[in-house]
Swiss-Prot record:
Designated name of the protein: Taurine import ATP-binding protein TauB
EC number annotated for this UniProt entry: 7.6.2.7
InterPro entries recorded: AAA+_ATPase (IPR003593), ABC_transporter-like_ATP-bd (IPR003439), ABC_transporter-like_CS (IPR017871), ABC_transporter_ATP-bind (IPR050166), P-loop_NTPase (IPR027417)
GO CC aspect terms: plasma membrane
């Protein structure tokens, strides 16, 4: 059964000539890792912002566990590309920050923060300052902070976009490990086709003007990694390469159609 349901969702910003999104129908349930891919202007970030409750749809309905989404909530954890960490706090305090705002006792929130740091392989970094961390380590802290509140679903806005290729692949592997261990549904947006194909159980390709779902693919490469196959072996597999090229061709077709319009 779906935890998150989007029915006929549209988004139209004041002053815009056309809708940003139109007639989006989606569901997200247990053991799903849903990835949205598309060219700039296809509404990927707008879609995530609607699910997060940062903006209100102009049409349609978003529900989580049957209740309407009407604003941000702790049941939706968000990880951004710009991780928005607090540079004057150490790693432990950053991970525990949301719990502190929620009134959780210091001993409880620090215990939970340490548990999440273990999950993202950052034990021993508790007292480090944010400026002492690499880009990948900062994203691990951001992921741990989002998970500390025990959200029902995890929303990720191009979380690995600013990382180098080696660190990006490490973070992709870490995300799949966390996804497998926590069983939390994930909605992630990216510009990276290989990343999308590798991670997704469900991949939606968004077309622009207005943003709409052009394709919905069901994939199993991430599940294969979770079952013990290496990332390098999967990404070198002929089936993976063929799927990646098919998705790339679809993206180019969307861009060509946009230019002709």
């Amino acid at each position: 059964m779906a935890l998150l349901q989007l029915e006929g969702i549209g988004a139209h910003y004041p002053g815009a000539a056309a809708p940003v999104l139109e007639n989006i129908n989606l569901s997200l349930g247990p053991q799903q890792l849903l990835v949205a891919l598309g060219p700039s202007g296809s509404g990927k970030t707008s879609l995530l912002n609607l699910i997060a409750g940062f903006v209100t749809p102009s049409g349609g309905r978003i529900t989580l566990d049957g209740s309407a989404v009407e604003g941000p909530g702790a049941e939706r954890g968000v990880v951004f590309q710009d991780n928005a960490l607090l540079p004057w706090q150490d790693v432990l305090a950053n991970v525990a920050f949301g719990l502190e705002l929620a009134g959780v006792s210091r001993s409880e929130r620090e215990a939970k923060a340490r548990e999440m740091l273990a999950l993202v392989d950052l034990i021993g970094f508790e007292q480090r300052r944010i400026w002492e961390l690499s880009g990948g380590q900062r994203q691990r802290v951001g992921l741990a902070r989002a998970l500390a509140a025990d959200p029902r679903i995890l929303l990720m806005d191009e979380p690995f976009g600013a990382l180098d290729a080696f660190t990006r692949e490490q973070m992709q592997e870490l995300l799949l490990q966390v996804w497998q261990r926590t069983a939390k549904p994930v909605f992630l947006i990216t510009h990276d086709i290989e990343e999308a194909v590798f991670l997704a159980t469900d991949l939606i390709l968004l077309a622009p003007d207005p943003g709409r779902i052009a394709q919905h693919l069901q994939l199993d490469f991430g599940r294969r990694y979770s079952a013990g196959e290496s990332a390098r072996a999967i990404k070198s597999d002929p089936g993976f390469i063929e799927t990646r090229e098919q998705v790339l061709a679809s993206v180019f077709a969307q861009r060509a159609g946009e230019q002709r319009a």
